Amino acid sequence: MPTTREHLARARQNLAFAQQFNLKTTPYLDWVVTAYFYAALHLVDALLWEKDKVPGGLHEIRRDYVKSKSYLRAIRDQYKELKDHSEDARYRLITMTSTRIEQKIIPLYKAIEDHILPQLPK
C-alpha cells in the first residue's frame, strides 16, 4: 500500500503536470482538470493513510470516507465538485475553458490542499 509520503509525491507530480500548461493556449484543458482532481485525490489518500491506515481504492469508497471522516468532512463539497468537473471533462466530454479552470478548478483544489496539508507531517 502506498504511504503518506508516496501519495504526497504523486499529488505533487499531478499538480506540477497541471501547472505546466498555458491555460490560454493549450488544447489539453481536459487533462489540466483531470490532473488537479488526481492531485486532490492523492492528498485525500495521504491523509486517510496517515490518520487511519486506510489504503486508496475505489472512487465510491473514497467518497464515503470524505463524507464520514471528521478530518475530511469540511472539504466534502469541494472534493465532490472537483470530481464532478473531472468527470465532465473525461466522460461527458464537456469543453473546459481557462476561465472555468482559473475561477473554479484551481480554487477547489486549493481549498482541499489548504485543509489537508496542515494535518500531515512536515
Predicted feature descriptions by range:
Residues 1-122:
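Terminal alpha-helical segments
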